[in-house]
From Swiss-Prot:
HAMAP family named among the record's database cross-references: Pur_nucleosid_phosp
Organism: Bacillus cereus (strain B4264)
Family as reported in the entry's similarity comment: Belongs to the PNP/UDP phosphorylase family.
The keyword Transmembrane belongs to this UniProt entry's keyword annotation: no
Subunit structure: Homohexamer; trimer of homodimers.
Lineage: Bacteria, Bacillati, Bacillota, Bacilli, Bacillales
UniProt-recorded name of the protein: Purine nucleoside phosphorylase DeoD-type
């Protein structure tokens, strides 16, 4: 057991999907996995282990934002030996040619969070995805005939911004979308020498106002989940 996860040793697979929403974790387990067991319900942050195409995989909710995902990633790696961590979540598009329900794979993540500046005073550490996981996820998506975008995303500390000027500027520099967790995941994976990836579905467009409902975000976006699972079981 760890502080926030009540699983016993051996109950969590080496490869794990990390949705922010614990109800999405439940949906993934019930929809895509077989022989499922629930190993965590601490603070309602559900975690499950099962099999996908005959291979063992887990799924764990992380909550929203850099501080919350950092708790679960630290504990999954340090206490349970997880080696491959794939975030599956939503993001808001900031490029005109990125549409709602498009799939984005984050190659790296810029951020306004102070997490890395506290670790690297005076430097801006650039965390990146694991290339093997990225390629496997990209190939899985293209084999399904999907238009998968790969590039930079913004990991933001603030959901409700007073000004969108900086977001617009980042878009001018090619950043594809905004989310709230990837930079923490990639930085911790680098610290501990494990593999990480973020596979994201565009749930809304920051500038056009197009959006999906909360129910759709929780129980659809299956293509993103299948891409992540296919990549996870190949590691």
């Amino acid at each position: 057991m760890s502080v926030h996860i009540e699983a016993k040793q051996g109950e969590i697979a080496e490869s794990i999907l990390l949705p922010g929403d614990p109800l999405r974790a439940k949906y993934i387990a019930e929809t895509f996995l077989e022989d499922v067991t629930c190993y965590n319900n601490v603070r309602g942050m559900l975690g499950f282990t099962g099999t996908y195409k005959g291979k063992r995989v887990s799924v764990q909710g992380t909550g929203m934002g850099v501080p919350s995902i950092s708790i679960y990633v630290n504990e999954l790696i340090q206490s349970y030996g997880v080696k491959n961590l794939i975030r599956v979540g939503t993001c808001g598009a900031i490029q005109k040619d990125v549409k709602v329900r498009d799939v984005i794979i984050a190659m790296t993540a810029c951020t306004d969070s102070n997490m890395n500046r506290l670790t690297f005073p005076g430097f801006d550490f650039a965390p990146t995805a694991n290339f093997d996981l990225l390629k496997k996820a990209y190939d899985a998506g293209t084999e399904k005939g999907l238009h998968v975008r790969v590039g930079n995303v913004l990991t933001a500390d603030v959901f409700y911004r007073e000004s969108m000027d900086m977001v617009k500027k980042l878009g001018d520099y090619g950043v594809l979308a905004v989310e709230m967790e990837t930079t923490a995941l990639y930085t911790l994976a680098a610290k501990y020498g494990v593999n990480a990836l973020s596979v994201l579905t565009v749930s809304d467009h920051i500038f056009t106002g197009e959006e999906t409902t909360s129910e759709e975000r929780q129980t659809t976006f299956n293509e993103m989940i299948e891409i992540a699972l296919d990549a996870a079981i190949q590691q």
